C-alpha cells in the first residue's frame, strides 16, 4: 500500500479511528484538513473534494500513487485491516 492521504478533522471521532488504525499499522500517511459542510476551498462540499468523495463526508482516504479513494470510517477500517 502506498502512502495515504487522510482527509478530515482531527477532532472528528471517525477520523481519529482511521488515524489510530494507520498509526498502529505503522502506515505512512499525510493529513489534509477538510471543513465538513463548507462549500469553499478546503470544504467537504467543494467540487475538488466531491470529485474524490461524492458523498462529501469525512473521513476519506486517498492512495497517493494510484488515486484510489474510499470514504466512510467503517469501510476505511475494513480496507486497512486487510
Each language-model region and where it sits:
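GST-like domain detector, emphasizing the conserved glutathione-binding G-site
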Residues: 1-82
